[in-house]
């Protein structure tokens, strides 16, 4: 490779050590795990007294990606152990999941808990002063018995799928899998080739999860956004990998009051959602979504929404936007937000909008999953996109990123003969006056049901710098100046996307492609009487 002496070959991205930068340069935006993971590792190494975290997924087997991290070990198992041995307390809440309908992530959670338990025992044996508290936290809300009874056949079918999967394993592997899914075993009768679903009672269903992704260090520094910690989520800014391995995400680093408030939130949210204490009022720095268990479930499938600060902030910001809105999200399925955007577009002929989405949901693009929940999600997104397209007209650009290489399949992992880049970021910009970075997607689940957390920025210089970093990530290096300016960006991105779509993949510039509306319109299906927050 050019620039390397002799026969040296540059190692692949997952093997290279990635730079950390100045941890005191705050606030800071990090694009992809290439930038974010080394920072998180360095923050652990710098922590003096305590680390408090809440993640949907936190896998201690995740490799370390910074030179600083690799100086103490190979993976997060080693880094957490090293941190405890330095006398730093570590507390982590990892989301647990419905063992029937989300058994894979349920298993991952308990595998992580077992690994962290081993870390704690090793630290104790070494005489470490630091204490580790690792909690697997399932949301306390449950689907009401009457609603579960109506879904009896569907639930038993899910259990049968798990039994079929277990039945294909050797006995030792099956025993290990069941041990790693402590919530599933109670819904299965028998063993080996004689397993069958329990007839009664109907298994519980857990409608919500703790979806937040944040870590606080010494109550002074906050790492927050859309990125969990596992090897699947590692990607670089050039996304130079197969489509199913791409993962575009955004995380920010802030200090001061936001860190202190996030620390307090992590210390109380489990009691709040379980109705063991009142939900704290907003502190003004951290935006949250919180829902609680229902005191009276009746026939409801839903938790009780308690705090919807992220949704409220988006709806209010859209109404106040004057010139430009820029959104990156995994989903765009919130009817209230789509309605607010449509109202704002009709009321203000000067308002423009860029919305960047993945070309398809992850499970549909890479796993071929076509169950009813996937169809319902696509139905909602297609409806929301229709609403804002009618209102904005040519003042709206909806994009989906793809790499500039040829790749063709019959599935939705391909966009115009190129591999898609999977978007998981959750960042929203309103003019250069407000920016929201959070764990919340633009859908009812994130806005009303799941536990979410985010921060806002109001400094125009900071917001502009963050927005330009987002723009420059997608745009080609030689993009025209109008592609970076709010007043002209929509037209410039629309033209660039059209040029890319018309060109062979290898001649395209940047990642910007037009989102294709027809596949979602065709695939989506409405579900009568099912709350949109389900997806």
Named regions from a protein language model:
Residues 1-535:
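Charged, low-complexity intrinsically disordered terminal segments
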């Amino acid at each position: 490779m050019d620039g390397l002496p002799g026969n040296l070959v540059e190692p692949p991205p997952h093997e290279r050590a990635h730079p950390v930068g100045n941890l005191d340069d705050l606030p800071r935006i990090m694009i992809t795990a290439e930038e974010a993971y080394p920072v998180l590792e360095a923050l652990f190494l710098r922590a003096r007294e305590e680390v408090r975290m809440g993640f949907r997924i936190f896998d201690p087997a995740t490799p370390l990606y910074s030179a600083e991290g690799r100086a103490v070990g190979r993976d997060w198992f080693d880094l957490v152990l090293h941190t405890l041995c330095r006398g730093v307390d570590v507390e982590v809440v990892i989301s647990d999941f419905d063992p029937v309908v989300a058994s894979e992530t349920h298993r991952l959670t308990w595998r992580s808990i077992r690994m962290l338990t081993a870390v704690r025992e090793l630290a104790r044996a070494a005489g470490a002063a630091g204490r580790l508290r690792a909690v697997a936290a399932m949301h306390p809300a449950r689907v009401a018995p009457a609603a579960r009874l109506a879904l009896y056949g569907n639930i038993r079918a899910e259990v049968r799928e798990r039994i079929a999967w277990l039945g294909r394993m050797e006995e030792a592997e099956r025993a290990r899998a069941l041990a790693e899914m402590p919530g599933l075993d109670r819904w299965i009768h028998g063993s080996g080739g004689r397993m069958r679903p329990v007839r009664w009672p109907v298994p519980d269903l857990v409608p919500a999860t703790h979806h937040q992704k944040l870590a606080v260090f010494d109550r002074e520094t906050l790492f927050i956004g859309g990125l969990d910690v596992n090897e699947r989520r590692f990607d670089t800014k050039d996304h130079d990998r197969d489509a199913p391995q791409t993962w575009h995400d955004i995380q920010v680093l802030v200090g001061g009051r936001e860190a202190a408030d996030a620390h307090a939130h992590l210390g109380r949210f489990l009691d709040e959602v379980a109705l063991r204490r009142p939900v704290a009022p907003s502190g003004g720095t951290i935006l949250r979504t919180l829902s609680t268990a229902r005191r009276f479930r009746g026939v409801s499938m839903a938790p009780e929404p308690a705090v919807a600060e992220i949704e409220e902030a988006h709806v209010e910001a859209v109404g106040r936007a004057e010139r430009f809105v820029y959104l990156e999200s995994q989903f765009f399925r919130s009817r209230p937000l789509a309605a607010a955007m449509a109202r704002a577009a009709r009321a203000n002929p000067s308002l423009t909008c860029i919305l960047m989405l993945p070309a398809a949901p992850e499970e549909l693009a890479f796993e071929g999953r076509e169950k009813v929940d996937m169809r319902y999600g696509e139905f909602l997104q297609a409806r929301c996109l229709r609403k804002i397209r009618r209102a904005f007209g040519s003042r709206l650009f909806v994009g989906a990123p793809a790499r500039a290489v040829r790749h063709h399949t019959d599935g939705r992992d391909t966009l115009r003969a190129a591999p898609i880049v999977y978007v998981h970021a959750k960042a929203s910009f309103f003019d250069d006056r407000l920016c929201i970075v959070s764990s919340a997607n633009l859908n009812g689940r994130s806005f009303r049901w799941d536990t979410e957390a985010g921060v806002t920025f109001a400094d125009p210089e900071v917001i502009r710098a963050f927005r330009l970093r987002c723009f420059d990530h997608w745009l080609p290096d030689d993009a025209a100046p109008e592609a970076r300016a709010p007043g002209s960006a929509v037209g410039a991105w629309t033209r660039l996307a059209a040029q890319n779509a018309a060109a062979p993949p290898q001649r395209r510039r940047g990642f910007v492609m037009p989102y294709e509306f027809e596949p979602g319109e065709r695939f989506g299906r409405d579900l009568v009487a099912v709350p949109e927050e389900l997806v």
